[in-house]
């Protein structure tokens, strides 16, 4: 653990970017988290990945960071977003930060599933482990300052009243 006031070394070299690496990294990280909750594994969905790519490009183009209102179209897609400094995060680090929210997860009825009392502290994680979700597709886009990761899920998770274990 770093000492107070001492920042850990950060690797500033550009991170590898490749669609095959993105797919394998995302599937592995999602399914490892899901395995811990006995949720069935997700399969990659190219249509979801295309939707994610369109939205990631829009976020990068507009330099905004907000959920896509169109993800609510029928069928409603679940969505996880990440934004970080350009080339500072590998794919594993991007998804790892979302999975790390699991440290605040507590079993219960959604949205009462956070040990902090705030569902926003676990919302990415609960979508990742959502047992009814079966498919995922992710994509990234970059602008001069940031990398954006968008993951889409079907069926969507984070449904109020559902019990998570």
Predicted regions mapped to residue ranges:
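Short, contiguous pre-domain boundary segments
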Residues: 6-16
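N-terminal secretory targeting signals
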Residues: 1-4
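Short, well-ordered surface patches within globular domains
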Residues: 14-76
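Disulfide-stabilized extracellular recognition modules
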Residues: 87-165
């Amino acid at each position: 653990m770093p000492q107070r006031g001492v920042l850990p070394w950060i690797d500033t070299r550009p991170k590898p970017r490749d669609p095959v690496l993105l797919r394998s990294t995302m599937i592995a990280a999602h399914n490892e988290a899901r395995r811990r909750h006995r949720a069935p594994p997700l399969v990659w969905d190219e249509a979801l990945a295309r939707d994610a790519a369109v939205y990631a490009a829009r976020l990068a183009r507009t330099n905004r960071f907000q959920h896509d209102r169109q993800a609510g179209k029928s069928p409603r897609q679940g969505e996880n977003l990440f934004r970080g400094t350009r080339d500072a995060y590998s794919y594993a680090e991007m998804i790892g930060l979302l999975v790390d929210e699991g440290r605040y997860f507590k079993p219960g009825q959604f949205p009462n599933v956070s040990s902090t009392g705030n569902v926003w502290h676990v919302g990415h994680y609960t979508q990742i482990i959502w047992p009814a979700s079966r498919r995922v597709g992710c994509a990234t886009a970059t602008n001069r300052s940031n990398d954006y990761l968008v993951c889409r899920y079907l069926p969507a998770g984070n449904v109020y009243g559902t019990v998570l274990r």
